[in-house]
């Protein structure tokens, strides 16, 4: 099974991904962790994020498909915040005839910003970055053909 997450910056996607990885004994891959390890201090704006994120995607796709072929649960802590991102994630499970689930974290902007400002990266974890990234956020729709599990802020506590 492939599990992925949709939620605004600071909504708790990483926290939930870690919890689910523990519960399912699945393999968790995190875009933030990979980017910060492979490209330390190189991402300071959205353009740089996209550039480096795009370099990861073909590698992650291959690894994910290999794991799904082995019937392992894969928890991808990669953003599923646009229809294009969700389509890419879903396509990996479709190609391997594996099931998928998208957790949608429905958390208010105020709560996201509050959580974001508590995080460790002062270069990217700012209200300004939240507003810039949030412009691209699209709530997932069942018409996209994805299995959605909604999670509210109370459930995340």
What are the residue ranges of the model-derived segments?
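Glycine-rich phosphate-binding loop used to anchor ATP phosphates in small-molecule kinases
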Residues: 52-96, 100
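The conserved Walker
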Residues: 8-9
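Conserved glycine(s) of the Walker
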Residues: 12
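Conserved phosphate-donor/acceptor-positioning beta-strand/loop module used by diverse small-molecule
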Residues: 96-115
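Walker A (P-loop) ATP-phosphate-binding motif of ABC ATPase nucleotide-binding domains
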Residues: 2
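Hydrophobic anchor at the beta1->P-loop junction of P-loop NTPases
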Residues: 5
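Small-molecule kinase domains that catalyze NTP-dependent phosphoryl transfer to phosphate-bearing small molecules
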Residues: 121-157
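Conserved substrate/cofactor phosphate-moiety recognition/catalytic segment
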Residues: 15-72
């Amino acid at each position: 099974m492939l599990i992925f997450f949709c939620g605004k910056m600071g909504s708790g996607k990483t926290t939930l991904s870690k919890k689910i990885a523990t519960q399912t004994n699945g393999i968790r891959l995190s875009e933030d962790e990979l980017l910060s390890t492979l490209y330390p201090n190189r991402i300071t704006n959205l353009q740089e994020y996209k550039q480096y994120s795009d370099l990861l995607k073909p590698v992650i796709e291959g690894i994910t498909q290999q794991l799904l072929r082995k019937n392992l649960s894969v928890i991808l802590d990669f953003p599923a915040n646009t229809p294009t991102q969700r389509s890419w994630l879903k396509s990996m499970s479709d190609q391997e005839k594996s099931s998928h689930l998208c957790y949608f974290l429905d958390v208010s902007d105020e709560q996201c910003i509050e959580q974001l400002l508590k995080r460790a990266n002062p270069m990217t974890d700012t209200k300004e970055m939240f507003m810039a990234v949030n412009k691209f956020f699209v709530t997932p729709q069942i018409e996209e053909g994805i299995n959605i599990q909604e999670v509210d802020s109370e459930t995340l506590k």
